[in-house]
Amino acid sequence: VHRGLIFLPLNDGYTNDELLYYLRDSESKLLITDKETSSELKSKKLDQGFIIETIEKDSFGSISKKLIKNISFEKPVSRNLNDIAAILYTSGTTGRSKGAMISQENLLSNAQTLTEYWHFNSEDNLIHALPIYHTHGLFVATNVILLSSASMFFLEKFELETIFNYFPYSTVLMGVPTFYIRLLDSKKLTKKIVKNVRLFISGSAPLTKEINCLLYTSDAADEWL
């Protein structure tokens, strides 16, 4: 997006058939993935119509090597607000998944609105344990942090022990209902452990009435209000 490209986030758990559907339907020209997926696609000669570059968890790979050699790639490209920034595919509950085109203005206005509504500022520290191939973890959480100059603890996944370790240094947790169900099942969830957390956010799916009631009657209840 920084370089004017259109970004298509994809679940790394997709099968080859699913992956190829999204790549071909979106007419993608470049796939950035891990070495394992790259090797598998190339060995089966499925890498037709697009270039494959690799990147690993340590941020190194063929794409990072090329970026290091091409310093000019770091320079941002000016875009118009109505230019497409990303394509997000629907869940496909009523048929084959369809790509929704998200404009630069969509991302900016959403981040501005949520930053103001949630009162984010540079003093906030967000616990981020959401998948970044969904809009919640990728655009909602990340863009709000960038716009407000806040900080975040970027975790690979949601693990209770890790979350509790970060609570004392955090002011916000963004999660999904299952996060809060697991937190409520733990005896570690107390007023003391979450005393610095000013905001708990649940998205992606409805938070049931039962879970809401449990949150408000838990040992950490004062912090949810």
Locate predicted features.
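Structural core segment of the AMP-binding/adenylate-forming
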Residues: 2-66
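Conserved G/P- and acidic residue-centered "switch" motifs that form tight phosphate/ATP-binding loops
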Residues: 4, 93, 149, 204
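Conserved helix-loop-beta element of the AMP-binding
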Residues: 27-29, 46-56, 126-127, 171-175, ...
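Conserved S/T- and glycine-rich ATP-binding loop of Class I adenylate-forming
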Residues: 31, 84, 90-93, 126, ...
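Conserved pre-ATP/AMP-binding loop-to-beta segment of ANL
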Residues: 70-89, 95-96, 119-125
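Conserved AMP-binding A3 loop
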Residues: 85-112, 223
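Conserved AMP-binding/adenylation subdomain of ANL enzymes
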Residues: 108-125, 133-172, 186-188
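Single conserved hydrophobic/aromatic residue that forms the stacking wall/gate
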Residues: 216-225
